[in-house]
C-alpha cells in the first residue's frame, strides 16, 4: 500500500534550524521519521529538536558549518553514525542567498555561495547515496529556487548555483534511480523566512505577482518535501517541482 508514513526511517535535513529546513524537519518527524537536524546554531537546533520531541517525535542535533567538501563529508560521516549506519532521506536545504549586481561582486562571496549551494550537496550525495543504492531504497530532495529558472536582477550568482543544483538533481536521478534511489528537487517562490523578512513590504509585493497572490509559509514548502520523501511519491523521479504559487508559469 502506498503511504506517506516514514516510521522506521531516518532523515538528515541540512539548514534545519530555521525557515524551510525547520518546517521540513518537523513535517518529516510528524510522518514518523527520526530526524537529524543539521545546522550552525546550536541554540536554534536544540529548539527544533525540543519542538519535535514535544510533539512525540524523535530527533537529534548535528552542528556543522557546511561550506566545502570536507565539511560535507564530515557531516555525512557523523550523521551516518548517529543514524546507526542508515540514512533513508536526505534533504539538501542549507544555502546562501547573498544578492548583488554582477559588477563588483566579491569573488570570496561567489565562491562561498557555490560552495554551500552546490559543492556541499554534491559531496553529501557522494557520501550518502551509495549506501542507499546498496539497500535499493532512499530519497534525496534538493531545495532550489524559482530564481534558477528566471532572470532576477541581483540574483545571478545565487540563481546560477541553484540552476546547477537542478541539473545535478536530474543527473543523480539517472545515476542512482536504477538502484532504487529517488532524487528530486523543490523550487520555492517567495517564502516568509527570517532571511527575507528584512524586505518588508517588498516581499509582499513580490508574492502578489504570483497567481496565488501571497507569500508562502515555510510549512507549505515542507509539505511538498515530505511528500517527495515518502513512498507516496514512488514514481516521482528527477523532477524539479515548482512550489512558487504559479510565479514561473506566468
Report the location of each language-model feature.
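Conserved glycine-rich cofactor-binding loop
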Residues: 10, 17-18, 41
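Short, small/polar-rich loop/turn modules that mediate ligand/substrate recognition or access, typified
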Residues: 91, 177, 182, 236-238
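Substrate-binding pocket helix/loop in short-chain dehydrogenase/reductase
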Residues: 101-114, 206
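Active-site helix of classical SDR
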Residues: 125, 161, 169
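Alpha-helical segment proximal to the catalytic Tyr-Lys
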Residues: 130, 174-178, 234
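Residue(s) in the substrate-gating loop at a strand-loop-helix junction
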Residues: 145
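C-terminal substrate-recognition "lid" of short-chain dehydrogenase/reductases
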Residues: 214-243, 248-249
